[in-house]
């Protein structure tokens, strides 16, 4: 009887733990909510719609910028004049017909005007809102002509060029899972199509309530077949 029990224990210990697939949830690689870059301004034009694919630094919202454009043009003309004045004072100083003090004063005035123009250009650039990531616009909160503020979102953008599938596995599996490990994931909504991913995060904490460990698997998704919110199945502890 003892021999049978020992044999049974040996057989059970040789069976891989958690051989049954663990279900996980697909999430985007990144989610960004974009707001206005200035405290308050009228939207001159919304340049994207829901579903638009965008690239990093692409223009997505144009705020009203007529005043800033005018300020830059005025600064450019002022600099042209001050360049002419500075050259004249420098020439007079070189020919000993003018003072060094006047030449330095006009040169300093020119440099200050250039700095001021850079500040005006920055104010103009802030009126054009750029996408911070490559991705897809999934939510549009504002329309052309509405007010944009730093407290209210304009658009939501997600990046699903790669996706993260989040699993919660038993703590005993932790020792068999490591970052960089290749894991095969089946996506239920794609008729069980199998994708190869890599573990990119193993939570060093156990969930206090369930005792489970969070594990993330990253999968390449250049064709966008896998959607956020789908379910994935994977085996751990094999």
Segment roles from a protein language model:
Residues 163, 167-193, 219-234:
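Surface-exposed connector loops and short turns at secondary-structure junctions
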Residues 21-42, 115-132, 157, 200-207:
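Short beta-strand-turn/beta-hairpin segments enriched in glycine/proline and small hydrophobics
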Residues 25, 41-47, 53-59, 130-173, ...:
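Surface-exposed patches in structured soluble domains
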Residues 36, 48, 65, 142, ...:
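Short, conserved catalytic or interaction motifs in soluble domains
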Residues 59-61, 67-68, 188-192, 238:
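Short, charged beta-turn/beta-strand-edge "cap" motif at the junction between a beta-strand
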Residues 4-16:
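Bacterial N-terminal signal peptides
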Residues 52-136, 141-144, 149, 164-166:
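Amphipathic alpha-helical coiled-coil/rod segments that serve as protein-protein coupling scaffolds
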Residues 138-139, 193-238:
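Structural microfeature recognizing short secondary-structure transition sites
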């Amino acid at each position: 009887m003892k021999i049978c029990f020992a044999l049974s224990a040996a057989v059970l210990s040789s069976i891989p733990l958690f051989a049954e697939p663990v279900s996980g949830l697909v999430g985007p690689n990144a989610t960004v909510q974009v707001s206005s870059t200035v405290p308050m301004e009228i939207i001159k034009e919304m340049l994207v719609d829901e579903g638009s694919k965008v690239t990093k630094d692409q223009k997505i919202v144009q705020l009203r910028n007529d005043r800033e454009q005018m300020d830059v043009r005025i600064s450019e003309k002022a600099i042209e004049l001050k360049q002419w004045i500075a050259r004249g004072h420098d020439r007079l100083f070189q020919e000993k017909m003018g003072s060094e003090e006047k030449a330095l004063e006009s040169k300093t005035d020119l440099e200050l005007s250039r700095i001021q123009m850079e500040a005006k250009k920055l104010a103009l650039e802030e009126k054009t809102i750029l996408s911070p990531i490559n991705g897809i616009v999934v939510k549009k909160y504002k329309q052309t002509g509405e007010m944009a503020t730093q407290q209210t979102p304009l658009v939501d953008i997600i990046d699903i060029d790669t996706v993260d599938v989040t699993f919660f596995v038993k703590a005993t599996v932790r020792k068999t899972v490591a970052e960089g490990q290749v894991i095969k994931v089946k996506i239920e909504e794609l008729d069980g199509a199998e994708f190869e991913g890599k573990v990119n995060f193993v939570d060093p904490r156990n969930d206090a309530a369930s005792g489970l460990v969070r594990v993330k698997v990253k999968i390449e998704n250049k064709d966008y077949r896998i959607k956020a919110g789908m379910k994935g199945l994977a085996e751990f502890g094999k």
